[in-house]
Amino acid sequence: MKRFFGVSNNQPAPTLDEATKRIGGRMGQMDEKINGLNQELLAYDKQIKATRPGPAQNAIKQKAIRVLQQKKMYERQRDQMASTSFNMEQTKFATESMRDTITTVSAMKQGAKDMKTQLKHIKIEDVDDMQDEMQDLLDYNNEIQESLGRAYQTPDTLDESELEAELMSMGEELELEASMPSYLMTPSVPTTDPHQSSVDEYGLPIGQEASQQVV
């Protein structure tokens, strides 16, 4: 029955990678054959140069021509394979680029969808209000820091030159007082109570009448 109806081919189609590798392998085989033919041509060339013109040399030339024809055939086949491989590489690159583009577009669509969902929870007015509030708080904090860092200054009336002059005059007054006799000095303000009883030179209390007699 299989001979009449055949068998369905369920094998998967080769991929571009597989086809490219296969052609690359065949190109390698062609290169080996071409290199081998080049070695034969070199050998025939030496024989032709070493042989005198005549039937023997002509026979060697005929063999060399056949080898050269075979080499040309392999080179044409190799060039065709190289062109096919280049086209397949271009197709592979274009296919991969399209896949990358599809993946990128899909990811961007999902990203846009996620952004729309997240933006529903954010309002620009709320962001502006928050920024204004933060700026106000920072300004207020700066004012507090400036107030705390303010230096305490002496009144403007206390000039340094005036203080220096006062200090010099105080020194002169102190020197004058030190050199002046005690009886010429201005009496100091009494510190005792006038109604308090007086005492004599021995420390004994003096009566009021006695005090009047002394006066």
Swiss-Prot record:
One of its GO terms (biological process) is vesicle budding from membrane. Residues 188-199 have a biased composition (Polar residues). Gene3D superfamilies: 6.10.250.1710. GO terms for cellular component: endosome membrane; multivesicular body. It is a peripheral membrane protein. Residues 186-215 are annotated as: Disordered. Residues 29-81 form a coiled coil. The keyword Phosphoprotein does not apply. The keyword Heme does not apply. Its main location: membrane. Keywords: Coiled coil, Endosome, Membrane, Protein transport, Transport. Belongs to the SNF7 family. Probable peripherally associated component of the endosomal sorting required for transport complex III (ESCRT-III). Probable peripherally associated component of the endosomal sorting required for transport complex III (ESCRT-III) which is involved in multivesicular bodies (MVBs) formation and sorting of endosomal cargo proteins into MVBs. MVBs contain intraluminal vesicles (ILVs) that are generated by invagination and scission from the limiting membrane of the endosome and are delivered to lysosomes enabling degradation of membrane proteins. This is Charged multivesicular body protein 5. It comes from Dictyostelium discoideum. The gene is chmp5.
